[in-house]
A protein has these predicted regions:
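C-terminal structural segment of proteins
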Residues: 1-289
Length: 289
């Protein structure tokens, strides 16, 4: 195995593009190192990106948007007061990834690149309207987060490409987000269903909404029908019922030891309504209490 410590994303991309074997990028390492120690994975080229400038930075830009380095951990997001205030749902999602120790190492960039349909932070990123910078052999491009996962363990990243930054929009006035999941245990488990909602209000009516569902399909879903179900409403009971129905209709889950298809589908409808209520209250400036 060759171990690389590039000083730039361009160098990292070049190494990956030239590799003739299996490659892995290393930031938090909470998955790749476990796989290596368990002899599940032995990459030919392990590319450690932690020496690249800016990978640990959380930066608020002049327009209020945010840029997250790809080695920023969930714990670091949670400890950043202004970011947590702006995007509590996204931070809550990151806070659910593993144990306290894992949260001190795991990154939401890695959570995205794993391609897991049950990844906690990915629905929240999608609901937020996050995009990523991707560096590759032909330069840099911007892509919406919802276009990165394409199936279990698979992403749309091409050979030699890696995510070089995550971009989160500015928090608009009278808007809020939330993330909820269902798990069999009280903590440290994989989501049976996850749901993130981000919405904006004008005169208490919803004028913008994004709803994302996790663990109910081969990849995390951005569900336009859920958004349409609540647009123009003040999230009354009829709107919540329509939202739940739209969430259920979007589901195409598997049955496994953690939940049947029917159970996951039902829970998706319940979580969508609950997450929407929390996001709506936050958009109104109300406390979560």
């Amino acid at each position: 195995m060759n171990y690389h410590t590039p000083s730039s994303f361009s160098d990292a991309s070049t190494i990956a593009a030239k590799s003739t074997g299996q490659i892995r990028f290393l930031a938090g390492g909470t998955d790749v190192l476990v796989q290596m120690r368990s002899d599940i994975l032995t990459p030919d080229d392990l590319i450690d990106v932690k020496q690249i400038q800016g990978v640990k930075d959380i930066t608020q830009n002049n327009n209020g948007s945010w840029t997250l380095g790809i080695a920023v951990t969930g714990a670091e997001m949670s400890e950043h007061f202004e970011f947590k205030k702006a995007w509590p749902g996204l931070v809550e999602a990151a806070d659910l990834i593993g144990s306290t120790q894992i949260q001190g190492r795991a990154t939401i960039a890695g959570n995205l690149c794993n391609g897991s349909p049950a990844a906690d932070s990915v629905p929240a990123q999608i609901a937020a309207g996050a995009t990523v910078s991707i560096t590759g052999p032909t330069g840099e491009r911007i892509e919406a987060v919802e276009n990165i996962p394409i199936g279990p363990g698979k992403t749309s990243l091409k050979k030699g490409e890696l995510i070089s930054a995550i971009h989160i929009p500015a928090r608009e006035k009278h808007s809020g987000d939330a993330y909820l999941r269902f798990i069999p245990r009280t903590e440290m488990d994989i989501a049976v269903v996850g749901c993130a909602v981000n919405l904006r209000l004008e005169n208490d009516s919803i004028v913008e909404a994004r709803v994302a569902l996790g663990a109910v399909a081969p990849k995390v879903l951005l569900v336009e029908q859920c958004s349409q179900a609540i647009l123009g409403t003040k999230l009354d009971e009829e709107a919540l019922s329509n939202l739940s129905a739209a969430a259920e209709n979007a589901c195409n889950p598997i049955s496994d030891k953690r939940g049947t298809k029917d159970f996951r589908t039902n829970v998706a409808g319940v979580l969508a309504a609950r997450a929407a209520k929390i996001a709506y209250n936050r958009a109104q400036g109300k406390s979560d209490e």
